[in-house]
């Protein structure tokens, strides 16, 4: 046991210096790794808990406790060993609880999968089952191989990319400044540049957040930044005034504050509304240039990462434009990894990472996307396969049925497309740069400045350089690399180690997580006495990174990436491009990258000996090193941006043409198009009598504006059009007091039109918006969905003793073409809405399920149908500015209540005892309301009551009425 006591000496001082709270158990999380909840002490404890068996920790405590002599006994050592041992025990408890939970849920999910696959198998053609199994492209989508349309035949395209978090700019990117500004930022910027240079592409917009915080460069606050491509040019393509690639910064969230990605969720709808305005304006502008006056709508809206995924889904639904999605780092994969560590519970993880919001956004992205772009097959089969909305076997069968023209029973699956990431080839190495091992062909004065900044660390700068480029975060596993280097004397004698860990000023000013990792690295350098053998420069420019690769290649070194999991592996491709062989993690993208490039070795990132052995083997075997270098340079063209864009655009061409419904006969008749302000009444949490009073009082206080035509009204509800008409007739009101009705939970829009010369109720005919019907039919399951829901409804029962009673029944009277209604007998026994949505996704039925009428009715509508989306549709079609819209809601409502609150419109919450108490449909949310709605936003106000004075004051406050 004596050998296992050494960890005490290396960690105890740092733990004690951090204070009593360093590993206290009364905080919400034991070892939170992000956003100010991480300390060096916690990181050290994590290393201990991970690396040592619970029995060893317990024995160490016993030894400390057994020292009875005052000279020998160390009370602090005794206390700390006891506390760390208990942390290890708690870790095992978490692991056991999570294992039980997964074990309990797995049979249910597997049964649903089996039933669905069986349904699909019943109608397969003879021979179809066996044929699919061996075809990887049929398994879940397309790889980059195979026949596809030629990009030269593409019309001039407008493409929209979205990446919301981090610091995004075209030049001098601050990669590594924080956890949100990493490889993804570089990827989307270079993708935008490359696409804009591709044949057939007219304009690419990269939409991100405008940041006006005082501690950040002014460039992040510029509304528009033109991106200049330095890669490949298309001289034959005509360019117009608005062609090219641009970063468009949309203001949303607090104007003077930078937000981490975990805190962006409440402001997503605000971004969507701002992006809608930009896309509509730009489409019309491009149309004037190249579209003969007709708007040129985006060919695709492509979201990157979960937050941008849900934004792209909402934009796709509002505009009826195809959506693509790239997940980058998936929430379920992160959640599973954190739970396996067993250090904190699901609730604690969600508190820190808002992981439930992230996973739901990714599920919704699967629902809405036509294609999902992955970088590797492993990402599809092991990561996306964790999601309710995707399953490899079912995807294979659905793809086969589509190819055969067979019935899919209303089921849909997004196409998974494997397109490896591209890299900029502007700095590709040439053979002559490697000529001469001993003599430098260029004078020292011509060497890039960053070379001297690195070489000054080394006692012997001529040794081969092991290079790592990674942010100082635990998942990058930099400490294991330093340990592997420090513990292998032959490797230390053979090579130097260079760590490019972002830019920093002072460690004390870094975020806690980065500071902890960097402190650990410096401690290890001191412990192994690696001075003169390890370089860790404080600063470098993004433009100097290729020079750093070239320096490592000049010394005949190697690039190493031993992250626990690597999603993309762009740095590996960049290293190969500069003639540098690689040592890479065997988890993630490097596996497939190395299959293509064949330029290095793969290792287990958890095995320090394997890391050291692989590095020594590669650097000591000159023939192996040369072969890896040559293979990398020979095959690197497969990861070029032109190749990436060619594959990308060939997939975009396969998407069905869709565009917003702007134009048509009703534009000339609908009065809504001339309104300055629109008041939307969406109050669900009141009885019909209170709803009528709210309508009357609102119209009363805006009588002057209504008469002048400057203000219009929209009723937004889950009621059918016949129920709305009956309500207004019973109240003695004409339907024409409203400009439009959003009914059936957003699946229908009606306009009240006169059928005679006198304004009587009987002569007002509600005219349905046919364009809206076409707008929302995307992936609607129709009769196949209805049959499955009817079957499901028979299984939802309440039990009284031995008697089972069905509680959900089909309701044809309140159903329509795009709304399947079900009557609920006993809302208290309803399954949570999240479970119903999970079931629909497992069945590949893409729809939006809602509980309404105090959970006495279930409405199932198309995936892009909702009251919130219908409002955006009206604004786009009739040219209404969202900031001029006021939405009236109650204190609660139908299950889509949260969607009505956020955005650029003004929201008035009517508070008071007249509200029906919130029922269980709002008490079983996947995440708290405040996680997705900024209730303290200046766009949201609350009033007590709905009297005329109350309504007048509220409408004056939001600018609909003058003071």
UniProtKB/Swiss-Prot annotation:
GO terms for molecular function: sucrose-phosphate synthase activity. Its EC number is 2.4.1.14. Expressed in germinating seeds. SUPFAM superfamilies: UDP-Glycosyltransferase/glycogen phosphorylase. The keyword Acetylation does not apply. It catalyses: beta-D-fructose 6-phosphate + UDP-alpha-D-glucose = sucrose 6(F)-phosphate + UDP + H(+). Activity is regulated by phosphorylation and moderated by concentration of metabolites and light. The keyword Transferase applies. Homodimer or homotetramer. Plays a role in photosynthetic sucrose synthesis by catalyzing the rate-limiting step of sucrose biosynthesis from UDP-glucose and fructose- 6-phosphate. Involved in the regulation of carbon partitioning in the leaves of plants. May regulate the synthesis of sucrose and therefore play a major role as a limiting factor in the export of photoassimilates out of the leaf. Plays a role for sucrose availability that is essential for plant growth and fiber elongation. Belongs to the glycosyltransferase 1 family. This is Probable sucrose-phosphate synthase 2.
């Amino acid at each position: 046991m004596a050998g296992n006591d050494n960890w005490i000496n290396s960690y105890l001082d740092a733990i004690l210096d951090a204070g009593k709270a360093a590993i206290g158990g009364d905080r919400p999380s034991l070892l939170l790794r992000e956003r100010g909840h991480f300390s060096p002490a916690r990181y050290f404890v994590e290393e201990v808990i991970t690396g040592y068996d619970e029995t060893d920790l317990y024995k160490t405590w016993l030894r400390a406790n057994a020292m009875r002599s005052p000279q020998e006994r160390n009370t602090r050592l005794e206390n700390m060993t006891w506390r760390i041992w208990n942390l290890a025990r708690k870790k095992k408890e978490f692991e056991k609880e999570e294992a039980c939970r997964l074990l309990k849920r797995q049979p249910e999910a597997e049964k649903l999968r089996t039933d669905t696959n069986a349904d699909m198998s019943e109608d397969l053609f003879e021979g179809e089952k066996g044929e699919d199994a061996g075809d990887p492209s049929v398994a879940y989508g397309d790889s980059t191989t195979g026949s596809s349309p030629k990009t030269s035949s593409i019309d001039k395209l407008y493409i929209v990319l979205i990446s919301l978090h981090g610091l995004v700019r075209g030049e001098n990117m601050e990669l590594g400044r924080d956890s949100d500004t990493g490889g993804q930022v570089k990827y989307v910027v270079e993708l935008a540049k490359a696409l804009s240079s591709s044949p057939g592409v007219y304009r690419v917009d990269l939409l991100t957040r405008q940041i006006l915080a005082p501690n950040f460069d002014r460039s992040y606050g510029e509304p528009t930044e033109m991106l200049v491509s330095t890669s490949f040019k298309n001289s034959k393509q005509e360019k117009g005034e608005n062609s090219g690639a641009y970063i468009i910064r949309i203001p949303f969230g607090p104007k003077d504050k930078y937000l981490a990605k975990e805190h962006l969720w409440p402001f997503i709808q605000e971004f969507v509304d701002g992006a809608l305005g930009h896309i509509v304006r730009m489409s019309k502008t491009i149309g004037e240039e190249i579209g003969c006056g007709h708007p040129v709508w985006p060919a695709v809206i492509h979201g990157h990462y979960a937050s941008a995924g849900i934004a792209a889904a909402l934009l796709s639904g509002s505009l009826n434009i195809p959506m693509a999605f790239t997940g980058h780092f998936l929430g379920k994969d992160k959640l599973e990894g954190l739970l396996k560590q067993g250090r904190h519970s699901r609730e604690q993880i969600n508190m820190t990472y808002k992981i439930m919001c992230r996973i739901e956004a990714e599920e919704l992205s699967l629902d809405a996307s036509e294609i999902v772009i992955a970088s590797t097959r492993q990402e599809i089969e092991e990561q996306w396969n964790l999601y309710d909305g995707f399953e490899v076997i079912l995807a294979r069968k659905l793809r086969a049925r589509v190819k055969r023209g067979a019935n899919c029973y209303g089921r849909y699956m997004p196409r998974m497309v494997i397109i490896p990431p591209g890299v900029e080839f502007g700095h590709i190495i040439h053979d002559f740069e490697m000529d001469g091992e001993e003599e430098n062909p260029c004078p020292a004065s011509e060497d890039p400045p960053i070379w001297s900044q690195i070489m000054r660390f080394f006692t012997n700068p001529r040794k081969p350089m092991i290079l790592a480029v990674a942010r100082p975060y635990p998942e990058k596993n930099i400490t294991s690399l330093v340990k592997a280097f420090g513990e292998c004397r032959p490797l230390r004698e053979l090579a130097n180690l260079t760590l490019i860990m972002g830019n920093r000023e002072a460690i004390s000013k870094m975020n806690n997580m980065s500071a902890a990792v960097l402190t650990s690295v410096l401690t290890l350098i001191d412990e192994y006495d690696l001075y003169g053998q390890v370089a860790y420069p404080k600063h470098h420019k993004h433009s100097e990174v290729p020079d750093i690769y070239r320096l490592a290649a000049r010394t005949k070194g190697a690039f190493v990436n031993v992250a626990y999991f690597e999603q993309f592996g762009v740095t590996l491709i960049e290293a190969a491009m500069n003639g540098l062989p690689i040592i890479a993690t065997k988890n993630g993208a490097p596996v497939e990258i190395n299959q293509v490039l064949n330029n290095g070795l793969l290792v287990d990132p958890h095995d320090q000996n394997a890391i050291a052995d692989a590095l020594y083997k590669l650097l000591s075997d000159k023939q192996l090193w040369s072969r890896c270098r040559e293979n990398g340079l020979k095959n690197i063209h497969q990861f070029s941006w032109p190749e990436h864009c060619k594959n990308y655009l060939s997939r975009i061409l396969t998407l069905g043409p869709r565009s917003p419904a702007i134009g048509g006969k009703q534009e000339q008749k609908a009065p809504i198009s001339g309104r300055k302000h629109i008041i939307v009444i969406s109050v669900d949490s009141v009885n019909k009598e209170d709803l009528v009073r709210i309508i009357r009082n609102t119209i009363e206080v805006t009588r002057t504006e209504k008469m002048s035509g400057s203000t219009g009204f929209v009723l937004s509800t889950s009621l059918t059009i016949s129920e709305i008409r009956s309500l207004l007739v019973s109240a003695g009101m004409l339907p024409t007091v409203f400009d439009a009705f959003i009914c059936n939970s957003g699946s229908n829009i009606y306009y009240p039109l006169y059928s005679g010369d006198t304004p009587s109720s009987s002569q007002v005919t509600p005219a349905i918006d046919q364009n809206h019907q076409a707008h929302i039919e995307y992936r609607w399951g129709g009769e196949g969905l209805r049959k499955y829901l009817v079957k499901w409804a028979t299984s939802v029962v309440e039990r009284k003793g031995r008697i089972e009673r069905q509680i959900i029944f089909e309701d044809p009277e309140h159903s329509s073409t795009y709304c399947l209604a079900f009557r609920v007998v006993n809302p208290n026994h309803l399954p949570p809405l999240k479970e119903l949505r999970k079931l629909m996704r497992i069945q590949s039925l893409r729809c939006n399920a809602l509980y309404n009428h105090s959970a006495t009715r279930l409405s199932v509508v198309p995936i892009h149908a909702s009251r919130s989306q219908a409002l955006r549709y009206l604004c786009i079609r009739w040219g209404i500015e969202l900031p001029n819209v006021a939405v009236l809601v109650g204190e609660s409502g139908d299950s889509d209540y949260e969607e009505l609150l956020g955005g650029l419109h003004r929201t008035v919450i009517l508070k008071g005892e007249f509200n029906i108490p919130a029922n269980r449909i709002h008490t079983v949310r996947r995440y708290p309301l405040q996680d997705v709605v900024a209730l303290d936003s200046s766009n949201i106000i609350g009033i007590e009551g709905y009297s005329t004075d109350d309504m007048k004051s509220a409408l004056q406050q939001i600018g609909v009425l003058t003071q």
